[in-house]
C-alpha cells in the first residue's frame, strides 16, 4: 500500500488517500468483501476498533441493511491470507485461501489495514476509529483518531 498525493494539496481538510495494490492480499480481500456485501444488499459494513497501552483491536463489526433486512454474519466467504513458515533458517511466506465467516473476514481485514495505514496506533495513549465499507460507492474508508498526552509548560516570575 502506498500513500497517494491528494488531488488538491492546498486543501488541508482533504483526507489522505492510499492506493492498495489490487494483486495484494488486502486488495483481493477488499474486492471480495465489497462484492459479498453488495450481493447481500448491504448498504455499509463497519468495523470499530480501540486500543491503548500496546494492545487493541476490532471491538465490533456491524452491517447496515436497507429497511432492517436481516444479514447473516455467520455466512462463509473465501478470502486470502498470508501464512509464514520458518524453514531452512528463513521465513517463507505463501498466500492461501481460507473460509471465514463474513464477520471474521471483515474483522481480519480491518485489523490488517489499520496496521498498514496507522502502524503502531495502539501504542502509548492509543487511538480508535472505524473501517467503513461503503457498498454503494465501492470504497473502504478509515476514520481514525489518535490519542496523545499533551503538556503546556509555562514559567512566570513575579
Predicted features and spans:
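Long, hydrophobic N-terminal alpha-helical segment
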Residues: 1-44
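A short, structured loop/turn motif at beta-sheet edges
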Residues: 37-41, 101-105, 134-140
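Acidic, proline/glycine-rich low-complexity IDRs
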Residues: 122, 127-158
Amino acid at each position: 500500500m502506498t500513500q497517494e498525493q491528494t488531488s488538491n494539496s492546498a486543501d488541508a481538510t482533504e483526507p489522505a488517500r492510499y492506493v492498495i495494490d489490487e494483486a495484494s492480499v488486502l486488495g483481493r480481500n477488499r474486492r471480495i468483501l465489497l462484492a459479498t456485501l453488495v450481493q447481500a444488499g448491504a448498504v455499509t459494513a463497519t468495523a470499530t476498533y480501540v486500543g491503548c497501552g500496546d494492545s487493541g483491536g476490532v471491538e465490533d463489526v456491524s452491517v447496515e441493511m436497507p429497511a432492517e433486512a436481516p444479514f447473516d454474519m455467520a455466512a462463509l466467504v473465501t478470502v486470502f491470507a498470508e501464512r509464514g513458515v520458518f524453514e531452512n533458517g528463513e521465513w517463507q511466506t505463501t498466500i492461501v485461501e481460507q473460509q471465514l465467516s463474513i464477520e471474521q473476514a471483515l474483522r481480519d481485514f480491518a485489523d490488517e489495514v489499520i496496521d498498514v495505514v496507522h502502524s503502531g496506533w495502539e501504542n502509548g495513549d492509543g487511538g480508535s476509529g472505524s473501517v467503513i465499507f461503503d457498498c454503494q460507492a465501492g470504497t473502504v474508508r478509515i476514520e481514525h483518531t489518535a490519542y496523545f498526552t499533551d503538556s503546556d509548560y509555562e514559567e512566570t516570575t513575579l
